[in-house]
Swiss-Prot record:
Pathway: Protein modification; protein lipoylation via endogenous pathway; protein N(6)-(lipoyl)lysine from octanoyl-[acyl-carrier-protein]
Name used for this protein in its record: Lipoyl synthase
Enzyme class: transferase
Disulfide bonds: none
Organism ancestry: Bacteria, Bacillati, Bacillota, Bacilli, Bacillales
Record's GO cellular component terms: cytoplasm
């Protein structure tokens, strides 16, 4: 299945049609009116209709749309970031209210230009959402924030319902896939998050198809469990443009199912694995029982 050709043909199970109905169009208009960005749109996520219209979940990207890193799998723009917008937390919170979301994921570009890595705005966004939407559950998906403990503590003190930080790939491929991050620093970030707030579930994600072996995927699972990570998502890497890393292999859905079973056998409380699975997929199901009780009132 793997080849060295520049263009590996996409298998049939990855060919889907995006559903862009009136509901989708209305929500997209709302995002633009509030000068907000969603990963759902920017990444052209295939699950956007299911998440927005059916599951009432969405992923907002804060701290601007320009990243200070240039990871070789990611299509987000890189360069000189914009100034901090301290009104952004309230705009996100109001959009969550208008969209009547049951679960919201807040992620951000990496802001290595900021001493706190954007932690203060992240934390204020969590608090603003909770003030206006007390029953909506909140997941945060930050960068490693430079690996600075105080930055992570600022974020965890806001008490999100899930702390998600993605290792993205296996140990061997990390220097090539995300050169300005390290595998060990990401593991330490996840471990410290659990130490700060033991009752808050921690989560990470791996994309496969970059040349890793099955043994390396399993090793990554073991590394995550050794650092007390509760939830895992596994999805197929898709090359955003010709400038990005090539796809080495398209995994069959049966292979994803096998990986899911292995992950659950290792003690992960929840695992989503499939060709179109992304970090936020079915995120509303992954909160703890107390948070699920809140969702029922949303």
């Amino acid at each position: 299945m793997a080849t060295k050709e520049e263009h590996v043909r996409k298998p049939d199970w990855l060919k889907i049609k995006l559903n862009t109905n009136e509901h989708y169009t209305g929500l997209k208009k709302l995002m633009r009116e509030n000068r907000l960005h969603t990963v759902c749109e920017e990444a052209k996520c295939p699950n956007i209709h299911e998440c927005w219209a059916v599951r009432r979940t969405a992923t907002f990207m804060i701290l601007g749309s320009v990243c200070t890193r240039a990871c070789r799998f990611c299509a987000v723009k890189t360069g000189l970031p914009t100034e901090l917008d301290w009104q952004e937390p309230e705009r996100v919170a109001e959009s969550v209210r208008i969209m009547n979301l049951k679960h919201v994921v807040v992620t951000a570009v990496a802001r290595d230009d900021l001493k706190d890595g954007g932690a203060a705005v992240f934390a204020e966004t969590v608090r603003a959402i909770r003030r206006k939407n007390p029953f909506t559950t909140i997941e945060v998906l930050p960068s490693d924030m430079g690996g600075v403990y105080e930055n992570l503590k600022t974020l965890m003190d806001a008490r999100p319902d899930i702390l998600n930080h993605n290792i993205e790939t296996v140990r061997r491929l990390t220097p090539r896939v995300r050169a300005r991050a390290t595998y060990e620093r990401s593991l330490e970030f996840l471990r410290r998050a659990k130490e700060l707030q033991p009752d808050i579930p921690t989560k990470s994600s791996i994309m496969i198809g970059l040349g890793e072996t099955k043994e390396e995927i399993i090793e990554a699972m073991d590394d995550l469990r050794a650092n007390h990570v509760d939830i895992l998502t596994i999805g197929q890497y898709l090359q955003p443009t010709k400038k990005h890393l090539k796809v080495v292999k398209y995994y069959h859905p049966d292979e994803f199912q096998e990986l899911k079973e292995i992950a659950l056998s290792k003690g992960f409380s929840h695992c989503e694995a499939g060709p179109l699975v992304r970090s936020s997929y079915h995120a509303d199901e992954q909160v703890n029982e107390a948070a699920k009780a809140r969702q029922l009132k949303a």
